[in-house]
Amino acid sequence: MPSLPPEMIVLLAPFVQLFSDRVWRHAQVLVVGALLAPGKRTVTSCLRVMGLSGERHFTNYHRVLNRAQWSTLQAGEILLGLLITWLVPPGAVIVLGADDTIERRSGRKIAAKGCYRDAVRSSKKHVVHCFGLKWIAMMVVGPVPWAKRAWALPFLTVLGWPKAKARRGRHKTSVDWVRQMMKQVRHWLPERLLVLVVDGGFAAVALALACQEQQVTFVTRLRLDAALYHPPAPHSPGKRGRKPTKGKRQRSLKIWAARSDTPWETVDVDWYGGTRKRLAVFSRTALWYTSGVAPVAIRFVLVRDPAGQLSDAAFLCTELQSSPEQILAWVVMRWSVEVTFAETRAHLGIETQRQWSAPAIARTTPVLFGLFSFVTVLALRFCPSGQLPVETTAWYHKAEATFSDCLTLVRQQLWRTWFCTPSPLSADLAQFPREAFECLVNDLPLAA
């Protein structure tokens, strides 16, 4: 294995404890190969770009994923610590984003494969289903020095099984997984202020109650026909029967949106793309209730676009003292989760893996998601000032650095560390290493 940049060695050092010495040597090759390999992120493509095309014991590298003993949960805890250390100021609120995504896969031997709705290809009138794996990812959402918008950095990813193939007779929905992951993060960070932001698919009273029990602020989209209630009236002394948990039902948000006397307030909020936008909001507190579950106290925000470009929408927050501006700022940050899913597919080879064994499947995709966060922190280590070099062309002007620029910077530093050794100041000839020449001519031009 060639030498690595000192900045990368520092970030990799905490992960050494997860592996034995022999497995760690092979794991490093796969991690660096996944960063350098163009196109598919298979084990063989990682070996090829590392100059190990002639490695006869290539099965040892496959065993890192399908047989070796190590925990993705412990790796997620270590990665979360790195993200907080390098990107979250001390004492600041940690915003968490969670969502599920479908990795399209086919094959009879893939046990966790199911048929799911394809959110990317589907519309309101036309629903598209596909076979694949459902992944639920939790990310740290926050600012990075080189971008105006927040970035979502994955650190914990789990595989959701379809209901027909649920193991041990119990099926966990995406909401169940997010609740369990949220409790795990609270166990890791018992003293920090946490905010969990999810989309409308996770708008469940049970999840809101779980967040409230763990002292985690819960933010999500709210249906306009949601059942909202007033607090219960004081219980009369000596009155028999169970104490009421809710009072009279409040006016529906649909009615509030349709009324002409709704007391709208105008606010300027942080918007997508790092801009500002003026919106009209109406905010109150209520009890959110669904049958079979205890009601939870929330602050709802009904939002209207004065320009008429957006339809009315509502959002909720379990922190009753939060302002509408703060709630909407958290809601806008959630879109970075979708951007991360798209970036990992475009640049890290999500959906190009070819493993079929259950342990390898359960590890490969979480590792690739984790590499997104690892590359981001590593780019910050290479450029402490936050001024990343941006790749521009005559026909395309990029205003700020993106993940592709981070990955380009990391690759450049790796190649320079390996092959660009300093030459004497008086030298007339700089010799190009043969290993670099063979990689440039034979490996990098291979089709993706």
Task: Label each region the model flagged.
Residues L35-K40, G51-G54, Q69, R105, ...:
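Short alpha-helix boundary/capping elements
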Residues M1-F15, F19, E77, R108-I110, ...:
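Single, function-defining residue in the core of a domain
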